[in-house]
């Protein structure tokens, strides 16, 4: 299905649970328990943090963009996995903490004879990821595409 609209609107609702924890919901999707990461006050290891959600959003958006470009070019993706690591640091210009660099290591396995064509689509996949376009962080994708 082709994208027709030039504006897409999404919503989420957060409900505070006390302390530093909350639950995020959106429609009929499963609720997502959130808290700070363990290295911050009130952080919990068993809940998603905004930092981890951001990295997951980058990974999944890049994957979906890559899959769409592969499908459009009749390429068969047989396996796909990614691992993102991001650095948050205080920026010199405004002294605010922010993600400054994110590295995403992507492993994809294509049908025989399709790896080279898939490699040609990585720039488009990166360009068309809405989440990447929405951040000022330096996003470095390291693609490992095999057959």
Q: Can you annotate each of these PLM segments?
A:
Residues 1-56, 67-147:
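Extended beta-strand/beta-hairpin segments
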Residues 61-62:
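Alpha-helical metal-binding/catalytic segments enriched in His/Glu/Asp
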């Amino acid at each position: 299905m082709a994208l027709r609209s030039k504006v897409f609107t999404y919503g989420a609702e957060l409900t505070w649970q006390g302390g530093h924890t909350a639950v995020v919901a959106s429609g009929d999707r499963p609720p997502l328990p959130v808290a700070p990461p363990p290295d911050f006050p009130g952080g919990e290891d068993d809940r998603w943090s905004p930092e981890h959600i951001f990295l997951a959003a980058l990974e999944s958006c890049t994957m979906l963009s890559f899959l769409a470009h592969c499908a459009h070019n009749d390429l068969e993706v047989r396996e796909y996995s990614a691992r993102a690591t991001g650095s948050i640091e205080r920026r010199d210009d405004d002294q605010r903490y922010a993600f400054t660099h994110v590295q995403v290591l992507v492993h994809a396995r294509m049908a025989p004879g399709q790896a080279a064509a898939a490699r040609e689509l990585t720039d488009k996949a990166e360009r068309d990821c809405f989440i990447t376009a929405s951040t000022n962080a330096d996003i470095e994708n390291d693609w490992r595409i095999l057959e």
